[in-house]
Regions:
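Conserved catalytic-loop aspartate of Hanks-type protein kinases
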Residues: 190
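Conserved short submotifs of the Hanks-type protein kinase catalytic core
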Residues: 74-90
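Activation segment signature within eukaryotic-like protein kinase domains
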Residues: 113-114
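Conserved activation segment of eukaryotic-like protein kinases, specifically the C-terminal portion
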Residues: 165-179
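Catalytic-loop of the protein kinase fold
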Residues: 125-141
């Protein structure tokens, strides 16, 4: 059951869904839908995204399922990524809240954030996986000083030039490494983005 559809971003639409188990329990999930330009891109993106199912880290959002679906209304293929849902929002909302209240994020929280994100990035980089879209809205807040990386992007979809241009025009360019404007991604791109996010946190 779909509970909510969030405003679409340059690289997809995010849904909040609820699944009822046989025992009657209700679990919330986030589902990201990304449009694919053709069947080949969908296959490549799905193959890339399967690596996300193998990630098991306390500071990385758990991916539950991946599938490709056809939307008759727009006659297009969509890659769907089902992931863990955090009821506490994301880092972007936390930063905005602090700014509205003219409050600072405590140094201890910032230090824990940095340690958790460095550890999470080191974990994915060892497996030759890059995040490619690291920014505050893609970092989930799971506790007072607990955070999770979320919303990874696949290379196949990030190289869709039309979506890329839209993304560059949005605020996310504030966290993008210089080389990513030329469609190049490495582990250094993620580190650059993390530094920008850290600066954003400290400038509340």
């Amino acid at each position: 059951q779909v509970l909510e559809q969030l405003p679409p971003g340059a690289l997809g639409t995010m849904l909040t869904a609820q699944l009822k188990t046989h025992q009657g329990a209700q679990r919330k999930y986030a589902i990201k839908q990304v449009e694919c330009i053709d069947q080949h891109q969908a296959k490549v993106a799905l193959k890339e995204a399967t690596d996300l199912l193998k990630l098991h880290h306390s500071n990385i959002c758990t991916y539950k399922e991946l599938f490709v679906t056809w939307n008759n209304q727009v006659s297009s293929l969509f890659l769907c990524l089902v992931m863990q849902h955090s009821g506490q929002g994301d880092l972007s909302a936390l930063i905005e809240e602090k700014r509205q209240k003219s409050e600072k994020i405590r140094d201890k929280v910032v230090q824990k954030f940095l340690g958790q994100m460095v550890d999470a990035l080191f974990y994915i980089h060892k497996q030759n996986i890059w995040h490619r879209n690291l920014k505050p809205s893609n970092i989930l807040v799971t506790g007072e000083a607990s955070f999770m990386l979320s919303d990874f992007s696949t290379e196949a979809l990030m190289k869709d030039e039309l979506k890329w241009k839209i993304r560059v025009e949005e605020e996310s360019k504030s966290w993008m490494a210089p080389e990513t404007f030329g469609f190049s991604f490495t582990e250094k791109s993620d580190i650059w983005s993390l530094g920008c996010v850290l600066l954003d946190m400290m400038s509340c």
